[in-house]
A protein has these predicted regions:
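Short, cationic low-complexity segments
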Residues: 184, 222-233
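Short, hydrophobic/π-rich interface segment
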Residues: 141-201
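N-terminal, charged low-complexity regulatory/assembly segments
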Residues: 1-85
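A short, structure-level motif marking secondary-structure boundaries and short turns
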Residues: 65-67, 166-169, 224
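Amphipathic interaction/junction segments at domain boundaries or subunit interfaces
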Residues: 73-168
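C-terminal edge-of-domain segments
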Residues: 196, 202-212
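Short, charged/polar, Gly/Pro-enriched secondary-structure boundary elements
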Residues: 162-164, 212-219
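N-terminal functional module detector in eukaryotic proteins
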Residues: 206-208, 219, 225
Length: 233
């Protein structure tokens, strides 16, 4: 089915991004014979439209930067793929799909080094600027702790539309595969993420960010929990 024929309210919702569509169709091609691929893709498209039929209409559509590549609506598209193709896909495949959407931007920033005060302060300012967008749409409710020299950056989300969506539709089992990219993205900035909880299984997503050489990391070793979340002690 052509994207333009997909029925959902385009005044308040957005279509999945083209990179996301490419990822999903590539995975479908891995798992299904050629004669079935268009049918499976159409099932994913219809699932996406069905999910949007009773979804929040206040997330800003194209105006909200969280709805771009790898963002809220791409997560819904990936969950649509997971719903249709659960029998053939895997946790790692879903994790890889989100990485392929998010990480290219961070790879372009490989010159950033969070170990250096200059870059750490710029990273902090980027998070502070993001608050205005969150406050405008009230999608990801965000707060950032005051900056302290030689201490990790800290911010948190107390609401997350992707987590809210997954909880509503019984898809929390795949959320770790979508959330773990936060760790991989920080690693590309010579940084590390320290996290203890998420909006999926707690009241917030916490982000403590420090340079990859920071002694703070020794106090908070990383592990994977039973659900597949990357976490820290």
């Amino acid at each position: 089915m052509k994207d333009k024929k997909l029925l959902f309210d385009r005044k308040c919702h957005v279509l999945y991004s083209q990179p996301c569509k490419k990822e999903i169709r590539a995975k479908i091609a891995l798992h299904y014979p050629e004669a079935e691929r268009e049918t499976i893709w159409e099932q994913v498209q219809r699932q996406y439209a069905d999910f949007l039929s009773d979804w929040r209409t206040d997330l800003g559509g194209k105006m909200n930067f969280h709805n771009g590549v790898g963002g809220t609506y791409d997560c819904i598209a990936i969950m649509s793929y997971y719903t249709v193709c659960k029998a053939v896909t895997s946790f790692r495949e879903i994790e890889e799909m989100e990485e392929n959407l998010i990480l290219p931007t961070f790879r372009k920033l490989k010159f950033v080094d969070c170990n250096k005060p200059f870059w750490r302060k710029l990273i902090y300012r980027a998070f502070v600027r993001a608050i205005s967008g969150c406050d405008k749409w009230h999608d990801y409710e965000m707060s950032v702790a005051p900056y302290e020299t030689d201490k990790p950056i800290y911010y948190e989300f107390t609401s997350c539309p992707a987590a809210e969506f997954a909880i509503r539709h019984g898809l929390t089992d795949i959320m770790p595969a979508l959330c773990n990219v936060d760790y991989a993205s920080m690693e590309l900035l010579h940084a590390r993420l320290v996290r203890t909880t998420t909006c999926v299984d707690g009241c917030r997503c916490d982000y403590t960010i420090c340079g990859d050489k920071d002694p703070y990391l020794k106090e908070h070793p990383e592990y994977r929990d039973e659900a597949g979340f990357r976490r820290n002690r």
